[in-house]
Amino acid sequence: MRAIISLLLISAMVFSMIEAVPVEEGLQLFEGERGGCLPRNKFCNPSSGPRCCSGLTCKELNIWASKCL
């Protein structure tokens, strides 16, 4: 009986964490994959992947990171 109650509580906690991210925010996270552009100070890939919005270029900050500036 305790195992069933524990499983139900864990399931409820996981569900509440999943619902914590609004649908609109989730869609914004994947805007680059849909062909949208990246705004200022967002990470980009100069050789491939999502492109920066007009007027911005993908600048390499260091070996591991590039941002739209």
UniProtKB/Swiss-Prot annotation:
Q: Which Pfam families match?
A: Toxin_7 (PF05980)
Q: What SUPFAM superfamilies does the record tag this protein with?
A: omega toxin-like
| An example Gene Ontology molecular-function term | toxin activity
Q: Where does the secretion signal sit in this chain?
A: 1-20
**What GO terms fall under cellular component here?**
extracellular region
User: Which cysteine pairs are covalently linked by disulfides here?
Assistant: C37-C53, C44-C58, C52-C68
Predominant location category = secreted
Q: In which tissues is it expressed?
A: Expressed by the venom gland.
Q: Which residues form the propeptide?
A: 21-34
Q: Which UniProt keywords apply?
A: Disulfide bond, Knottin, Neurotoxin, Secreted, Signal, Toxin
* Record's subcellular location: Secreted
Membership in a protein family? Belongs to the neurotoxin 01 (U2-agtx) family.
Domain-related comment: The presence of a 'disulfide through disulfide knot' structurally defines this protein as a knottin.
> What does the protein in this record do?
Insect active toxin causing rapid but reversible paralysis in crickets. No activity shown in mammals. Does not show effect on mammalian voltage-gated calcium channels.
Q: What is this protein called?
A: U2-agatoxin-Ao1w
Give the organism the record lists.
Answer: Agelena orientalis (Funnel-web spider)
